[in-house]
A protein has these predicted regions:
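HIT superfamily nucleotide-processing domains
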Residues: 1-124
Length: 124
């Protein structure tokens, strides 16, 4: 499968340091930062540093180190923010959009972590 990566997308520019962000955590392969238009009291974006467009692209082509680092970083963020149920938090939602039907706005794979209120049903 072929994925067209646009290296001028906003997350690529953030990763290159061209656009500032409110970093929550950074690891070797992953950057997590606050969303500039939050949809919940807690809204953090977890972004792999590699050039991946969607989850399936990331899962198919990322190295084992990138895959593990990304998921452990996401879990670490939930714990750091006090929303992980295992750490006494009341929960969170993760969302990753892929392609036009999901309304993916930035063509760089990323995971939304949303928390801080009851999120309700995902779909009606």
């Amino acid at each position: 499968m072929s994925y067209a990566y646009d290296d001028q997308n906003i997350f690529a520019r953030i990763l290159r340091g061209e656009i500032p962000n409110k970093t929550v955590f950074e690891s070797e392969h992953t950057l997590a930062f606050h969303d500039i238009h939050p949809h919940a009291a807690v809204h953090v974006l977890v972004v792999p540093k590699g050039r991946y467009v969607t989850f399936d692209h990331f899962a198919a082509e990322a190295t084992a180190e990138e895959l593990v680092d990304f998921h452990r970083t996401a879990a670490r963020i939930c714990a750091m923010l006090g929303v992980a149920p295992g750490d006494g938090g009341s929960g969170y939602r993760t969302i990753a959009n892929a392609g036009p039907d999901s309304n993916q706005e930035v063509p760089h794979y990323h995971l939304h972590i949303l928390a801080g209120r009851n999120m309700g049903r995902l779909l009606p």
